[in-house]
Amino acid sequence: MLPLLRCVPRVLGSSVAGLRAAAPASPFRQLLQPAPRLCTRPFGLLSVRAGSERRPGLLRPRGPCACGCGCGSLHTDGDKAFVDFLSDEIKEERKIQKHKTLPKMSGGWELELNGTEAKLVRKVAGEKITVTFNINNSIPPTFDGEEEPSQGQKVEEQEPELTSTPNFVVEVIKNDDGKKALVLDCHYPEDEVGQEDEAESDIFSIREVSFQSTGESEWKDTNYTLNTDSLDWALYDHLMDFLADRGVDNTFADELVELSTALEHQEYITFLEDLKSFVKSQ
């Protein structure tokens, strides 16, 4: 039952979303910030454990703990139940973890990690191509039109696996002009992800294009930014071909989803372990 908790929309998702770490500050901060997405991992069953009809211990007076250990810290029956739940959840998440190590990207990309932010770097023919993405808020909601199970109701059918589809930024720098970078802000349209029947279709899209100075820590809003919503399709196709010639194509986008999903799952398990240690600590 426990692995399925990751596949049902969370009843208490809004509170857990606040626990997720904010993306580290970087020149890509604004472009990498995705639109708010509804949380998809359910901790809603957390308070509905077998045999419990209320949350004990929360109103007990602060002082020497009720268990009689004499530590003087606040740890309740609810905390113990929480730790037990997290232990079971961590165990089950490790069972369904597909990648014990992060998958490799083909095409000679080198991976650099900084918390939840990842960079893929590739040098080819006098150019440096950098792809940056952040796994925070990268899992889209999975709504199938069916009602959520009520408390105590078991989920019988296997739910779809969670997939991380982060926004990503492609930065191209030419060696003969290292002061200027062509920046393309890309994303995965939700209606295109997982559509295998249309082999010709692009599974990612370019949203914005701009030139930015490589020496600036923050990109300037005063630099002209081209929005592709009103762009001529011929120019847009050339931009997509420009990326494909540098290794950013559908194959790359598929592998990035696999890498991001593995990284997100890895960070999720680490978060559960940290949460367990925090609740358990005295």
UniProtKB/Swiss-Prot annotation:
Membrane topology: Peripheral membrane protein
Subcellular location: Mitochondrion matrix; Nucleus; Nucleus, Nucleolus; Cell membrane
Start and end residues of each stretch annotated as Interaction with MAVS: 168-213
GO cellular component: cell surface; cytoplasm; cytosol; extracellular space; GABA-ergic synapse; glutamatergic synapse; membrane; mitochondrial matrix
Protein name (Swiss-Prot/TrEMBL): Complement component 1 Q subcomponent-binding protein, mitochondrial
Residues found modified as Phosphothreonine: 214
GO MF term set: adrenergic receptor binding; C5-methylcytidine-containing RNA reader activity; complement component C1q complex binding; deoxyribonuclease inhibitor activity; enzyme inhibitor activity; hyaluronic acid binding; kininogen binding; mitochondrial ribosome binding
Induction: Enhanced cell surface expression upon platelet and monocyte activation.
Modified positions (Phosphotyrosine) in chain numbering: 188
UniProt KW keywords: Acetylation, Adaptive immunity, Apoptosis, Cell membrane, Complement pathway, Cytoplasm, Disease variant, DNA damage, Host-virus interaction, Immunity, Innate immunity, Membrane, Mitochondrion, mRNA processing, mRNA splicing, Nucleus, Phosphoprotein, Primary mitochondrial disease, Ribosome biogenesis, Secreted, Transcription, Transcription regulation, Transit peptide
Subunit structure as annotated in this protein's UniProt entry: Homotrimer; three monomers form a donut-shaped structure with an unusually asymmetric charge distribution on the surface. Interacts with CDK13, HRK, VTN, NFYB, ADRA1B, FOXC1, DDX21, DDX50, NCL, SRSF1, SRSF9 and CDKN2A isoform smARF. Interacts with CD93; the association may represent a cell surface C1q receptor. Interacts with KRT1; the association represents a cell surface kininogen receptor. Interacts with CD209; the interaction is indicative for a C1q:C1QBP:CD209 signaling complex. Interacts with FBL and RRP1; the respective interactions with C1QBP are competitive.
Disorder cited: Combined oxidative phosphorylation deficiency 33: An autosomal recessive disorder caused by multiple mitochondrial respiratory chain defects and impaired mitochondrial energy metabolism. Clinical manifestations are highly variable. Affected infants present with cardiomyopathy accompanied by multisystemic features involving liver, kidney, and brain. Death in infancy is observed in some patients. Children and adults present with myopathy and progressive external ophthalmoplegia.
Segments of this protein annotated with the region C1q binding: 76-93
Gene: C1QBP
Residue segments, region Disordered: 138-164
Similarity field: Belongs to the MAM33 family.
Record PTM Phosphoserine, positions in chain: 87, 201, 205
Function: Multifunctional and multicompartmental protein involved in inflammation and infection processes, ribosome biogenesis, protein synthesis in mitochondria, regulation of apoptosis, transcriptional regulation and pre-mRNA splicing. At the cell surface is thought to act as an endothelial receptor for plasma proteins of the complement and kallikrein-kinin cascades. Putative receptor for C1q; specifically binds to the globular 'heads' of C1q thus inhibiting C1; may perform the receptor function through a complex with C1qR/CD93. (Microbial infection) Involved in HIV-1 replication, presumably by contributing to splicing of viral RNA.
Modified residues (N6-acetyllysine): 91
GO biological process, alphabetically ordered: apoptotic process; complement activation, classical pathway; cytosolic ribosome assembly; DNA damage response; immune response; innate immune response; mitochondrial RNA catabolic process; mRNA processing
Tissue specificity remark: Expressed on cell surface of peripheral blood cells (at protein level); Surface expression is reported for macrophages and monocyte-derived dendritic cells.
Organelle transit peptide: 1-73
